[in-house]
Amino acid sequence: MSLTLREASKDTLQAENKTWRYYSLPLAARTLGDISRLPKSLKVLLENLLRWQDGDSVTEEDIQALAGWLKNAHADREIAYRPARVLMQDFTGVPAVVDLAAMREAVKRLGGDTAKVNPLSPVDLVIDHSVTVDHFGDDDAFGENVRLEMERNHERYVFLKWGQQAFSRFSVVPPGTGICHQVNLEYLGKAVWSELQDKEWVAYPDTLVGTDSHTTMINGLGVLGWGVGGIEAEAAMLGQPVSMLIPDVVGFKLTGKLSEGITATDLVLTVTQMLRKHGVVGKFVEFYGDGLDSLPLADRATIANMAPEYGATCGFFPIDSVTLEYMRLSGRSEEQVALVEAYTKAQGMWRNPGDEPVFTSTLELDMGTVEASLAGPKRPQDRVALSNVPKAFAASNELEVNAAQKDHRPVDYVLNGHQYQLPDGAVVIAAITSCTNTSNPSVLMAAGLLAKKAVELGLKPQPWVKASLAPGSKVVSDYLAQARLTPYLDELGFNLVGYGCTTCIGNSGPLPEPIEMAIKQGDLTVGAVLSGIRNFEGRIHPLVKTNWLASPPLVVAYALAGNMNINLATDPIGHDRKNEPVYLKDIWPSSREIARAVEKVSTEMFRKEYAEVFEGTAEWKAIDVVGSDTYDWQDDSTYIRLSPFFDEMLAEPAPLKDIHGARILAMLGDSVTTDHISPAGSIKADSPAGRYLQSRGVERRDFNSYGSRRGNHEVMMRGTFANIRIRNEMVPGVEGGMTRHLPDTEVISIYDAAMKYQQQGTPLAVIAGKEYGSGSSRDWAAKGPRLLGVRVVIAESFERIHRSNLIGMGILPLEFPQGVTRKTLGLTGEEQIDISGLQNLQPGKTVPVKLTRADGTTEVLDCRCRIDTATELTYYQNDGILHYVIRKMLD
């Protein structure tokens, strides 16, 4: 009997006097043919298939198809990818644990073994999304924000502690430690994973999926991973492989070096703009070229982090000597570093100078051409040269819907006993935030050095600026202190406010009341400048209409200038003690100064801060939970509720039902994000969710955020399509979650309309433009519509994660025929929709969609089914991926 490829490829290697078994790609190549020029990212996938070959979920034909990708730099085949581990943050992690607990209830009700609902691979949940910038600008800010976080989220944290003891291989990194992606980069990521199997140590690539779209940051360490929805991550941790098509791989060649004064942030904004224009949705991006020789790992991680912003599944940097240097710096053991080097060299995954893999398509960037940039005011891919920011702000200001804003007159206000004028274009938030940049010592040291020069010249921030510093790990505080830069940042208001995502995810906290009142009184267009990765409208703060992504030193600079109308390339940023003008170039640190400061970063800092990473504060340790297999649901809880998704589930799936007489709940434009569909930020008192919380006795000050309430479906379904900036074309000129209920045409909230339709037994549809569901890997952007009764979404195109999430929740994603849009069809939202033949649905094939207009005329469209794989079709036929997993457990 001939050996399988898996068995035939077994080999051993030596590292640090230890023997490791592994599945050798060179041995497999004796059967598969030459794979030396396969992109490194696909070699990781190939090893994954080889190691998991079982003749069922992974066959020799699957392995042959991936190796054969080289022939056309493309392959049309579905494969089953099994990541080594799962990463979560608390906004997505809490609902995931709610789902797991609800699955145990369903398995128990259907007569199965609840012990089967347990992770089969390691799961790390980092609590980083809950801290809010309530206090800022003084030494007490950090302590006060931590205290408030623990008070507000006590119930959620009790639940997560229950999950930690109830589920195996499930670890929680407590609040106040850092941001999940930076903790992953600095500590959790191994580059090469290993485990004891049958008394042998087995080595294989470190791979993962995460419940946050920026999981891709770890690609900078040569670890293949990307963001998925919570439901897909839950299935993965329970042993279900991730179904995917073999991806196209776009090669991005980097050459040269960054010019003096140019930062990694400027580079990533340029890369994002180029790749978004190229079109990389659903594709891998792999970086290569001699520019990598001098590109620090922190810069690579910054670029990899923004893969969701350029639309790619991942932004992969192969492992090389730069990777090993970073692993040593961040405190990984010499045994681990030696294993990574030996393994990747043996497998042909090591990057050598001059490597030119085969790619589907390529781009090239000479890093010497990158210029100082921001991105904004509403999308991360809209890069603006520093010198053009005032023009970009003015252009966006003119587009504001309220014509009464034309005057843009300053508004007088009083703050702390002093009178000021708040001008149009004021920078009211300046935040050094997000792991994208706070994982990068060079840009943080640059911010500190710029602050030092500014303070020494007597410059001060403008009084309306809310400044904050929220690093992604405690190591940042250590090296800023070691470089003696912390006092200067404090002097300019950039005091430590927390170790977490804060402003970048909308946890910017309230502005001082006089400033909020002035913005409302003058209907002013104000700005936020942040070192983050997302600037979608309504995300950072409800009153801030323009949001700009910038490097940390530019964040400090804009706090000093205080206005988006100031041209920092040519105008003074302020005046010194002698009233002489000071320009940005006068306080911008040189690359030599930055390099000297970065030398202060030491391995001891990483080892000290990560020695007790799972321990937490005294408040965390004091949280006590009772051990049990199933959760004790509390009827009066407004944070944690038993989700209803499995209430009516049977052991066998029912046949698919056609959709008849569906009404359109919302008709939306292009680039509708998951933030629009399911916001994470503040809850308005007069919204359906706000009214629900008040009816349950929750005071307005205790609303917390939508993100923190994701364990309660009652809040989340009411918050679906509730973003204050969403524009439903069925109600022109109206912003917010409103729609027309048909046929009576009453204008009411989307939630109230959906409930009326449910009472009438009417299925619902959503119509949209291009890039529907871009942004965060937010499974509530699919769960919420499902609970509202949405059966189908018809769009011009979908972003990858959201399309998958829709299928995972039993919602059908369809694409309009090429060249056909809601506008070319003249849709008003009054149409009714019929979709028949769903029992004969095929991946990627066309589906007839019948439109019946208000006047009775009809039209049939052949829409493309965006269920892309046979496995996804199976999930859809089971009413969702978790229903499928439960039924497998019952077999």
Protein language model features and the residues they cover:
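Mobile "lid/hinge" segments at catalytic clefts and subdomain interfaces of large enzymes
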Residues: 199-341, 350, 443-463, 495-609, ...
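Extracellular/luminal Protease-associated
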Residues: 288-295, 533, 754-755, 759-799
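Long, structured ligand/cofactor-binding scaffold of large enzymes
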Residues: 54-257, 264-269, 372-375, 394-494, ...
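N-terminal amphipathic, basic-rich helices that act as targeting or association modules
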Residues: 2-148, 295-305, 309-333, 383, ...
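Terminal amphipathic helices with adjacent charged low-complexity linkers/tails
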Residues: 82, 100-156, 286-287, 292-402, ...
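Extended C-terminal subregions enriched in glycine
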Residues: 464-486, 490-494, 498-503, 507-509, ...
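Acidic, glycine-rich flexible loop/linker segments
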Residues: 576-591, 803-875
